[in-house]
């Protein structure tokens, strides 16, 4: 037995020596190995961390911790269970609002002509919301960075079910990202808005008895900051930005390169989810297929220069009988001619953007070539923003007062859009719009844009501090509808109707301002960009559906509620909760319905229809019986003066 075991051991040792390298071989192999430093593996770069966010029927899971904090703070677990789809809509919408800090909107616009920048996100948030974004950092690094994108099924998709519905979140650790992009964290609740107004000369005439709005009960500081508009023109917007790129080439094609896809069709399709929105982006991601189906696969061989079809053969079969009566088949292969390359279907590209020099040349053709310093005398500064400063100015030789916006043209990020809006404002004039008067370009950089000036300030001050009756509300709505009817007739959608953008003159004039969100659409067509201010926003925009001019009608109805209650619905809620409530409830509650006339209630009902196809238009509303109650505009004068005196 021992002899057998020792024999087996010797055999194993012998076989091991045969198949094992000798020491010399090992030394030789070690010499051929590269140095350890050359084999070092570098650290990963441009990594993307994917997190799947789902809803298990009880709560959302997988959200980065900053988003979980904001979700639990603003929306209770009961509300999350009640309507998880509305929570998803609110998260996606709120995430997009973190795109970039709010910038001055005056004369910085989404072009009302065809422009690839129109599909970016332009939703306003309060200054406090965006200011906190710079100061908050995520403790979990890139994996839970608020640059995480939250994606879910669109509003038209199936309802969420347990375990089967996921959002796709991603965060990038690219070191080239700016701090503002890395630190877009959901912000704390905004602070209450101020009710202060600039002081004007004391009014000494007899003022009729007013109905001041009763003070609000003490509330936690959750109100967004309203803009302080001392005059007509200083308002704000975010400047949209887009990235350009080209679709992948068609496989097997040697044709001309496909031109870049228009940016309003281009997306970052890094996930298979139906959308991909992030705190850095305020636009919905739409899946666009870039590949073309060519039927059969074509392979080429370079040895003989012949082209062969990989899935098709043309052959002639010939049957030949042999001596034994068996039949053999000889296949004679006929080489087909080279296949014709399928034509590449190219989308019609938009016109190329103008260069800065071309914009400057066109601007010189529009502006007044003379020197404005001899015509306008600057009196005081009434507004300042990222794009420029607004002044009140007197016109030399007259008593006219105008608003002058002065901008450093060379530093404007969207020069062509600025040029386009000047062209549009010059073309479309109406008594109920804050109209463009003229413009100047001094030393090829100092751009002056002269506009109407309304000393009465905006409607917000009046509706917050006083209480208008139905006749006065009808008068304001009638003037706004005249302006909207004019814009809609020219296929222009305002997209940001609210009391902040309605300016009042000391003689009772009512004018719409802030054309920064305007967009021109072809008759019958719709848009799907997300723009406006959330509290006044229509459900179809919030749910990122296609929309048309009916969005202005919804916002007008919300502004009517604002004149009744002193604030729009959900203003006391945090932005995320407000978006959730709009998505869940649709039509807001009319708190004082019992106190309103039947005509006013019917007017509100026609404006606040969730289905835009059933919503009234300007023609129908201008003929509505409620507007027959409109008082003369002079009835607004005592209220405007009283507010300006405080």
From Swiss-Prot:
Outcome of substituting residue 388 to E: In cy2; probable loss of activity. Partial sensitivity to the heavy metal Cu(2+). During development, DD and DV motoneuron axons fail to reach the dorsal cord. Axonal growth is not affected. Mild defect in locomotion
GO cellular component: cytoplasm; dendrite; perikaryon
Keyword Nucleotide-binding: yes
UniProt domain CRIB: residue ranges: 41-54
Obligatory cofactor(s): Mg(2+)
Keyword list, A-Z: ATP-binding, Cell projection, Cytoplasm, Differentiation, Gonadal differentiation, Kinase, Magnesium, Metal-binding, Neurogenesis, Nucleotide-binding, Serine/threonine-protein kinase, Stress response, Transferase
Residue ranges occupied by any Protein kinase domain in the UniProt entry: 376-627
Active site location: 496
Gene knockout outcome: Isoforms a and c: Partial sensitivity to the heavy metal Cu(2+), which is characterized by a failure of larvae to reach adulthood. Partial reduction in basal kgb-1 phosphorylation and after Cu(2+) treatment. Several DD and DC motoneuron axons fail to reach the dorsal cord. RNAi-mediated knockdown causes a similar phenotype but less severe. In max-2 and pak-1 double mutants, defect in axonal guidance is more severe. Animals are also uncoordinated, defective in egg laying and in distal tip cell (DTC) migration, morphology and guidance, and exhibit ventral enclosure defects.
Pfam (any one): Pkinase
Gene for this chain: max-2
Name used for this protein in its record: Serine/threonine-protein kinase max-2
């Amino acid at each position: 037995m021992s002899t057998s075991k020792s024999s087996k051991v010797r055999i194993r040792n012998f076989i091991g020596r045969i198949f094992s390298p000798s020491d010399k071989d090992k030394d030789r192999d070690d010499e051929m190995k590269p140095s350890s430093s050359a084999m070092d593996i570098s650290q990963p770069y441009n990594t993307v961390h994917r997190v799947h966010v789902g809803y298990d029927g009880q709560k959302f899971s997988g959200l980065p911790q900053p988003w979980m904090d904001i979700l639990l703070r603003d929306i209770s677990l009961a509300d999350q269970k009640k309507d998880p789809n509305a929570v998803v809509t609110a998260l996606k919408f709120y995430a997009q609002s973190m795109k970039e800090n709010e910038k001055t909107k005056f004369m910085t616009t989404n072009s009302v002509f065809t422009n690839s920048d129109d599909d970016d996100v332009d939703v306003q948030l309060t200054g406090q919301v965006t200011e906190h974004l710079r100061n908050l950092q995520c403790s979990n690094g890139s994996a839970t960075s608020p640059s995480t994108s939250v994606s879910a099924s669109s509003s038209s998709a199936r309802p969420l079910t347990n375990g089967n519905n996921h959002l796709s979140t991603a965060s990038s650790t690219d070191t080239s990202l700016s701090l503002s992009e890395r630190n877009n964290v959901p912000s704390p609740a905004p602070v209450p808005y101020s009710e202060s107004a600039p002081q004007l000369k004391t009014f000494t005439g007899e003022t009729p008895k007013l109905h001041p709005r009763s003070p609000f009960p003490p509330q936690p500081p959750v109100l967004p900051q309203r803009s302080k508009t001392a005059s007509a023109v200083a308002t704000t917007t975010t400047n949209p930005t887009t990235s350009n790129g080209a679709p992948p080439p068609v496989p097997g094609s040697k044709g001309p390169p496909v031109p870049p896809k228009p940016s309003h069709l281009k997306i970052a399709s890094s996930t298979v989810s139906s959308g991909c929105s992030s705190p850095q982006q305020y636009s919905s991601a739409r899946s666009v297929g870039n590949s073309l189906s060519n039927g059969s696969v074509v392979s080429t061989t370079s040895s003989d220069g012949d082209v062969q079809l990989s899935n098709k053969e043309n052959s002639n079969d010939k049957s030949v009988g042999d001596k034994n009566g068996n039949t053999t088949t000889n296949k004679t292969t006929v080489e087909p001619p080279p296949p014709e390359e399928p034509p590449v279907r190219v989308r019609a590209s938009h016109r190329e953007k103008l260069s800065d020099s071309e914009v400057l040349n066109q601007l010189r053709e529009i502006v007044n070539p003379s020197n404005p310093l001899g015509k306008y005398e600057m009196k005081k500064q009434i507004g300042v923003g990222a794009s420029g400063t607004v002044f009140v100015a007197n016109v030399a030789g007259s008593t006219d007062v105008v608003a002058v916006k002065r901008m450093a043209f060379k530093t404007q990020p969207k020069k062509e859009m600025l040029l386009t809006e000047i062209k549009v404002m010059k073309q479309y004039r109406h008594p109920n719009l804050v109209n463009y008067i003229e413009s100047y370009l001094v030393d090829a950089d100092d751009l002056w844009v002269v506009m109407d000036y309304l000393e009465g300030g905006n409607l917000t001050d009046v509706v917050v501090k006083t209480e208008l009756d139905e006749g006065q509300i009808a008068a304001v709505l009638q003037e706004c509808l005249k302006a909207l009817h004019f814009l809609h007739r020219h296929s222009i959608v305002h997209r940001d109707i609210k009391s902040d953008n309605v300016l009042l003159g000391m003689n009772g004039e009512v004018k719409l301002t802030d054309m920064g969100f305007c967009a021109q659409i072809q008759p019958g067509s719709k848009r799907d960009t997300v723009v406006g201010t959330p509290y006044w926003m229509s459900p179809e925009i919030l749910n990122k559906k296609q929309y048309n001019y009916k969005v202005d009608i919804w916002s007008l109805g919300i502004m009517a509620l604002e004149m009744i209650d002193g604030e729009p619905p959900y203003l006391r809620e945090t932005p995320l909760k407000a978006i959730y409530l709009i998505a869940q409830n649709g039509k807001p509650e009319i708190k004082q319905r019992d106190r309103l006339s039947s005509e006013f209630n019917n007017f509100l009902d026609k404006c606040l229809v969730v289905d835009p196809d059933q919503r009234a238009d300007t023609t129908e509303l201008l003929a509505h019986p409620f507007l027959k109650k409109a008082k003369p505009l002079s009835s607004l004068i005592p209220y405007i003066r009283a507010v300006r005196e405080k």
